[in-house]
Regions:
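Short, charged, surface-exposed secondary-structure boundary motifs
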Residues: 117-125
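Alpha-helical substrate-recognition element adjacent to the catalytic core
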Residues: 2-118
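Conserved Lys-Pro-Asp/Glu-containing loop-to-beta segment of HAD-superfamily phosphomonoesterases
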Residues: 128-139
């Protein structure tokens, strides 16, 4: 069986942090790994901004619930699944993706997890594994 691995944001769905930046008007949240290649530095920047602006995970999730897959993404995935095992490898978070995964007919997704406090504030994140995309494809 052949396997096809895809990224998620910017490929099948809009960039989540950019959508949140547009909704909140905070341009600094538009930064992606193209702008800040060091993922830990980028996430530190994002989490600092979210904390400074008193946003909770639920605030981000509300914006995500309004998003839809990019045009053609659902049919593209459905067609791929007829011939291949499809795995999505993403630097996003399970806590972000549920509404979009439903719209994409629940593809297999490997991504990271957010850490939240009892009040719902995002306090950190846990990588699925170091260098996750490269290691997944390598195996």
């Amino acid at each position: 069986m052949d396997v096809v691995c895809l990224d998620l944001e910017g490929v099948l769905i809009p960039e989540i942090w950019i959508a949140f930046a547009e909704k909140t008007g905070i341009d600094a949240l538009r930064a992606t790994t193209r702008d800040v290649p060091d993922y830990d530095e980028l996430m530190g920047q994002r989490l600092r901004i979210v904390k400074e602006n008193n946003f909770k995970l639920g605030d981000i999730q509300k914006v995500i619930e309004e998003l839809e897959p990019l045009p053609g993404a659902v049919s593209f995935l459905d067609d791929l699944r007829e011939h291949y095992q499809v795995i999505i490898l993403s630097d996003t978070y399970y806590e972000f993706t549920r509404p979009l995964m439903k719209q994409l007919n629940w593809p297999t997704l490997f991504c990271h997890k957010l850490v939240t406090d009892p009040e719902g504030y995002v306090t950190g994140y846990k990588l699925r594994q170091p260098d996750p995309k490269r290691m997944s494809v390598k195996s």
